[in-house]
């Protein structure tokens, strides 16, 4: 590669001319002796300087975002840089560290945060917050007041009611109970998923099956060394699907055997769900696409390339219709066989972290880094409710298994939201109001889960605590402090055990029976 000063000067001269700086161009041309150069200006295309600068900028962006082997750095998409950012010293190292910090926040894997939370105890008491919205159209709910609630008695779960499962060698990001038996699946940064057998029929205590996520290299299976980011059981409890940062989804039997490997994503998989019928699996990836897979053949039925940035979450509305959300701030509702979204919801002003259909499939809830929770209906383009009460990013949401179309039809439907502001909020969506604000946590809350009867809500935070709340009163009824920040909480089908996965590699099972 060679660059002469005459060539640089000519491109600058042409840029000044094309930009209307005629006097500056004349002066610069005289001082740099442009007329004496042997460059044929007729062969140089317009905007040549801008074009070559853009290519250089793209090269710096690639340096920041792509490893030497061509893979995305930390599985992140190429970030757009400004020209000034690109010429700053150490831009590659600075931006890569920023990526690591962002990833640490999203996955709550920052050891520093865990250490900071070690000696913190919840001193704030539980509160109740209600706010009134407008009667017609979209409801905008603001935080009006908080009344602190008393905690009833000693709520600490004794150690003999908590089983700590160890085996993972890195953070355990996710866990999920088998819907028909006491098998708990967990997924970790150690590139494994595990199936823990917690049935009381086992004479030797809990046992584990290790599901090693491998890729083919040189004709051999080698560990992928990538995080297991998502997992989901089918409704019959016979198969477990996992998604990984290596870009592959996998289907396993409950005995731990690999049944299928699903490979069409071009980057990490962030979310993965079975449909109720159990014939399709839906996945969302950093490659901006979502894919419906045939669970029987392992083949992709349809890929949906509608997002303009990484897809973060998906949820089925029916057996062939689903919603997806993205860092592009959009929500698409898509149907198998349709080549365009059947509905697009826009209104969030930052990344949309999670979406969930209510039990009837009529209302879709979404939460975002813009600190809002929105409720959408297929019957209209604008949101039905715009719920504003959290003062930091909302990480996840869950609907209660109550109301019409559920096994608990006489109980009111509720929505829970978990935020980086360390609070959990319970919402009455029909009225568009916050009915309880749960304020015991001291660090970001990453997971919430309703018990099967909807009477209790479990929450897990990076303060290492799992709290169990009464959904009717908002009272804290059980509390457990683990040894690592909590990423995920989940209830078993019987509603008497809560599983929790943690940043220190542990998986906890809390027995809530008397």
Swiss-Prot record:
N-acetylserine: residues bearing it: 2
Domain F-box-like: 41-86
Biased composition (Low complexity): 124-135
Effect ascribed to mutating residue 171 to A: Significantly decreases interaction with MECP2
UniProt-annotated stretches for the region Disordered: 114-139
SMART domains (alphabetical): LisH (SM00667), WD40 (SM00320)
Consequence the record notes for mutating residue 446 to F: Does not affect interaction with MECP2
InterPro entries associated with the record: Ebi-like, G-protein_beta_WD-40_rep, LisH, WD40/YVTN_repeat-like_dom_sf, WD40_repeat_CS, WD40_repeat_dom_sf, WD40_rpt
Effect on the protein upon substituting residue 214 to S: Does not affect interaction with MECP2
GO BP terms in the entry: adipose tissue development; blastocyst hatching; chromatin organization; fat pad development; lipid catabolic process; multicellular organism growth; negative regulation of DNA-templated transcription; negative regulation of transcription by RNA polymerase II
Superkingdom of origin organism: Eukaryota
Domain note: The F-box-like domain is related to the F-box domain, and apparently displays the same function as component of ubiquitin E3 ligase complexes.
Function in brief: F-box-like protein involved in the recruitment of the ubiquitin/19S proteasome complex to nuclear receptor-regulated transcription units. Plays an essential role in transcription activation mediated by nuclear receptors. Probably acts as integral component of the N-Cor corepressor complex that mediates the recruitment of the 19S proteasome complex, leading to the subsequent proteasomal degradation of N-Cor complex, thereby allowing cofactor exchange, and transcription activation.
Record-stated family: Belongs to the WD repeat EBI family.
Protein name, UniProt field: F-box-like/WD repeat-containing protein TBL1XR1
Organism of derivation: Mus musculus (Mouse)
Gene name linked to the record: Tbl1xr1
């Amino acid at each position: 590669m060679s660059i002469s000063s005459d060539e640089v000067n000519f491109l600058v001269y042409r840029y000044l001319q094309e930009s209307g700086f005629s006097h500056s161009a004349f002066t610069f041309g005289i001082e740099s002796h442009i007329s004496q150069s042997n460059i044929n200006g007729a062969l140089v295309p317009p905007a040549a300087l801008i074009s070559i600068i853009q290519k250089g900028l793209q090269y710096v962006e690639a340096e920041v975002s792509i490893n030497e082997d061509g893979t995305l750095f930390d599985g992140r998409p190429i970030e757009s840089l400004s020209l000034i950012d690109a010429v700053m010293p150490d831009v590659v190292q600075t931006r890569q560290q920023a990526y690591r910090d962002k990833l640490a926040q999203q996955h709550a894997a920052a050891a520093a945060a865990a250490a900071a939370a070690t000696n913190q105890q919840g001193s704030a008491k539980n509160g109740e917050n209600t706010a009134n919205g407008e009667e017609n159209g979209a409801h905008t709910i603001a935080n009006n007041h908080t009344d602190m609630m008393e905690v009833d008695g000693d709520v600490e779960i004794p150690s003999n009611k908590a089983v700590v499962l160890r085996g993972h060698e890195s953070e355990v990001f996710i866990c999920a109970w088998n819907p028909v038996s006491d098998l708990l699946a967990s997924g970790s940064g150690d590139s494994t998923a595990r199936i823990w057998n917690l049935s009381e029929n086992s004479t030797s205590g809990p046992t584990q099956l290790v599901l090693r996520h491998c890729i083919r290299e040189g004709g051999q299976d080698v560990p992928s060394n990538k995080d297991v980011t998502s997992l989901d059981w089918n409704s019959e409890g016979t198969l477990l699907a996992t998604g990984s940062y290596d870009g592959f989804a996998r289907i396993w039997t409950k005995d731990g055997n690999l049944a299928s490997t699903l490979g069409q994503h071009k980057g990490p998989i962030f979310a993965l769900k079975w449909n109720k019928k159990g014939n399709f699996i839906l996945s969302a990836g950093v490659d901006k696409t979502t894919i419906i897979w045939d669970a029987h053949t392992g083949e992709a039925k349809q890929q949906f390339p509608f997002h303009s940035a990484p897809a973060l979450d998906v949820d089925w509305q029916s057996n062939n219709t689903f919603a997806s959300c993205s860092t592009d701030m959009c929500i698409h509702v898509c149907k198998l066989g349709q080549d365009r979204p059947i509905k697009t919801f826009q209104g969030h002003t930052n990344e949309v972290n999670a979406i969930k259909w209510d039990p009837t499939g009529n209302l879709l809830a979404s939460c975002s880094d813009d600190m809002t929770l929105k409720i959408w209906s297929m019957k209209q383009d604008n949101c039905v409710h715009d719920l504003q009460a959290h003062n930091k990013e909302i990480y996840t949401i869950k609907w209660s298994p109550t109301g019409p179309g559920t096994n608990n039809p006489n109980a009111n439907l509720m929505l829970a939201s978990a935020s980086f502001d360390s609070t959990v909020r319970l919402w009455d969506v029909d009225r568009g109001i916050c009915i309880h604000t749960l304020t015991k946590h001291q660090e970001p809350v990453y997971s919430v889960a309703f018990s099967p009867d909807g009477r209790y809500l479990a929450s897990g935070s990076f303060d290492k605590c799992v709290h169990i709340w009464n959904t009717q009163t908002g009272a804290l009824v059980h509390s457990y402090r683990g040894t690592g920040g909590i990423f995920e909480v989940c209830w078993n089908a019987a509603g008497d055990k809560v599983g929790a996965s943690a940043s220190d590699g542990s998986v906890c099972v809390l027995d809530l029976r008397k």
